[in-house]
Amino acid sequence: MFYCRSGFEKECAGEIQDKATQLEVFGFPRLKNNTGYVLFECYQEGDADRLIREIKFNELIFARQMFAVAVEVSDLPKDDRISPILDALSEVEDVPCCGDIRIETPDTNEAKELLKFCRKFTVPMRQALRGKKMLTERDSNRIPVLHICFIAPGHCYVGYSYTNNNSQFFMGIPRLKFPADAPSRSTLKLEEAFHVFIPKEEWDDRLASGMWGVDLGACPGGWTYQLVKRSMFVHAIDNGMMAQSLMDTGQVKHHMVDGFKFEPPRKNVTWLICDMVEKPARVAHLMGEWLIKGWAKEALFNLKLPMKGRYDEVLQDIENLKDFLKKNGFQYKLQAKHLYHDREEITVHIQAISNISPH
């Protein structure tokens, strides 16, 4: 089972089908539009476990979470939902003992009604599973996570994921609060990207105070805000106006020029960030140009998606960018994700591994 943004089931299914085919795991996706999840039916027993081990979760773009389904339980009675779930699990072999439980729903308006129930249900369900030795006495992040996903009040899928190859977040969504002093809600996209792409233990080194960043298409400053908050200095590139609150910090230099023409005055930039409303192929190429010239060490940018053929467009743009970097002898780590705060766009992160002198 794979969670995704409602309305992007087709893209998620296409991606899973591609990954499964590469691994020679045969099956087919089952999906309904606007449900917020995709099921992949494997033809062979044990292949679901193979998929969640061998598909690298951090290489999936459209899936927020993945787990192997052990059982589907429907028609749960209102007065006792626990016993049928325990009975169904007891009949299945190969379900590992788990160290944590997440009782979730897909991220849709309809399913949100179920979340209150999920929260109340978690404590008694956890106790019952511990009583049956299906869950460890204490939470452990070293062994699998048990997922119970309710798609309707009496209907759930129960399964497990591996902690070294899943999303650490409940429902695959980081819970972030909008900062009251941020100039726009877009600030949450960049904050979420930091949580998803950069391990927390590396934040002090890679998001350090005193670094320089460049924000292409910065106005009014939602993304710049995240760098300023971390005590960085920022070249904000936009013909529009920046929020006065950011300018007052003394950490922002505003350049009223075209983002495609700007060149940093000093080549001491660590972070290049970009959320421009432009053709995705054009933005991807611009990011590649900056990186091969050594103008930035890390790039984080959004690619806007077309109305049709979204998955194909994403694949093409990322493939072209990889080819461009490879041809120029540039070594890198690349991740892309359709984040919770993204809508018709995906976010891409590239970290330079090559040590290139700026030129």
Swiss-Prot record:
Catalytic activity: cytidine(2498) in 23S rRNA + S-adenosyl-L-methionine = 2'-O-methylcytidine(2498) in 23S rRNA + S-adenosyl-L-homocysteine + H(+)
One MF annotation (Gene Ontology) recorded for this entry: S-adenosylmethionine-dependent methyltransferase activity
Enzyme class per UniProt: transferase
Keywords: Cytoplasm, Methyltransferase, rRNA processing, S-adenosyl-L-methionine, Transferase
Residues involved in S-adenosyl-L-methionine binding: S186, C219, P220, G221, G222, D238, D258, D275
Record localization: Cytoplasm
UniProt keyword Flavoprotein, yes or no: no
Cellular component, GO annotation: cytoplasm
Subunit structure: Monomer.
Family statement drawn from the similarity comment of this UniProt entry: Belongs to the class I-like SAM-binding methyltransferase superfamily. RNA methyltransferase RlmE family. RlmM subfamily.
HAMAP family found in the cross-reference section: 23SrRNA_methyltr_M (MF_01551)
Name of the featured protein: Ribosomal RNA large subunit methyltransferase M
Organism: Aliivibrio fischeri (strain MJ11) (Vibrio fischeri)
Gene name tied to this protein: rlmM
